[in-house]
Amino acid sequence: MIKPFRIDIPQADLDDLNDRLARTRWPNEVADAGWDYGFPLARLKELAEYWRAGYDWRAHEAELNELPHFTTEIDGQNIHFVHVRSSKPDALALILTHGWPGSFLEFLDVVEPLSQDFHLVIPSIPGYGFSGPTHERGWDLVRIARAWAELMRRLGYERYGAQGGDFGSGISTTLGAVAPERVVGVHVNYLPSRPDPDADVELSETDEARLDKVRRLMANRPPYQALQAATPQTIGYALTDSPVGQLAWIAERFAQWTDPRSPVSDDRMLTDISLYWLTATAASSGRLHHDTSRGAPPCPVPLGVAVFPHDITQSVRPLAERLYDIRHWSELERGGHFAAMEVPELLAADIRDFFLTLLK
């Protein structure tokens, strides 16, 4: 059964958030530390005070409620999703999947341009936001992809495309693997490339530089990834009890992974962080890093790739072509890891170009 859903956070939860923010116990900071030890204290205090006294959750809640929200139970888990129908009845449907530390609202600014040509289904990953928390182990890429296939079946879509970045990329390519007869193609804006000494391919200087960046990242695994992959429950206690802890944990990702030429606004970032806080899904969302250790199966359907210059890493096409049926490859001029929020017009145009060309 599919049920309409409306976001309506109890006022008591908002009052509790403001009270906790007002009573934050701050650590000291080394003079002139900058980013050497992590998120700078002055900037975090600024964000926390704005979250408490300036940011208006109700205004953003109303904006989110302008979209048609629904919930349904799949494989024992409540699944939240947005479903926007195009004015074109025979339009192709696209299922758009966010990543961590994002949420369904990543796609807020691509809904209008994409819905001109496509029906849109935008789910929250199990364990995230209004699809959370999860209550059992095993929600990995394959299980989520199978849930997406069932969701699209329930909505009556026999053939559809998939799109995503971060975890949304892995979920989308996995959906192409588990339902290749249904998925016409997959578009991603994040496709990790790993060094492969056995690959007999010619690499450009740009390719080599991108692989060097990957090697450095692999040698110095990001702390957030190590913690959430190993002990998401442990870090979850701190993030679920301290809004400033949750703020720092996610705001650091936005600061480091976005293009300085196209920053995400504080309001949009705080709405994303508020979704994690108000649904108490820090731990359950982090479990996805733990449960996806086995990676994604091969994806046999056509793939489109959009590469953004300020993403965590950039894809290497000769290596990607050994693994995927690449039909479309774009090197965009601006944007980072949160492309749908940073440069929605560029991402929407690239998604449209890939799928409309594929359908010709």
Model feature map: region roles:
Residues 90-99:
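Short beta-strand element of the alpha/beta-hydrolase
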Residues 13-85, 268, 277-293:
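Non-catalytic accessory segments flanking enzyme active sites
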